Amino acid sequence: MPEPIDAMSFEDALSELERIVRGLEGGQMKLEDAISAYERGAALRRHCDAKLGEAEMRVRAIVQNDDGTTGTEPLADTGESGR
């Protein structure tokens, strides 16, 4: 059984997505297998997009202080708890 997508790192999800794309491009999959692979690939893409969005928010929160040192700035509260 494949690893749950929510538990995957960005790198692992991207690697699996690349394998799926290569398999689909090869044209050797049976139709049902191709559809299942496409569905998982779409979910992996959404997961990767979310991970990139989170990383972008973290990078944007890094600021340079007046004294030239680098610090972080708290992100605006999104109303979501547990993150």
Curated annotation (Swiss-Prot):
EC number: 3.1.11.6
Subunit structure of this chain's protein: Heterooligomer composed of large and small subunits.
Region (Disordered): 63-83
Protein family according to the UniProt entry: Belongs to the XseB family.
Superkingdom, taxonomy of origin: Bacteria
NCBIfam families per UniProt: PRK00977.1-3, xseB
Subcellular location: Cytoplasm
Main localization category: cytoplasm
The protein's name in its UniProt record: Exodeoxyribonuclease 7 small subunit
GO biological process: DNA catabolic process
GO MF terms, alphabetically ordered: exodeoxyribonuclease VII activity
Catalytic activity field: Exonucleolytic cleavage in either 5'- to 3'- or 3'- to 5'-direction to yield nucleoside 5'-phosphates
Keywords: Cytoplasm, Exonuclease, Hydrolase, Nuclease
Gene label: xseB
Cited PANTHER family: EXODEOXYRIBONUCLEASE 7 SMALL SUBUNIT
Summary of the function given for this chain in its UniProt record: Bidirectionally degrades single-stranded DNA into large acid-insoluble oligonucleotides, which are then degraded further into small acid-soluble oligonucleotides.
GO cellular component: cytosol; exodeoxyribonuclease VII complex
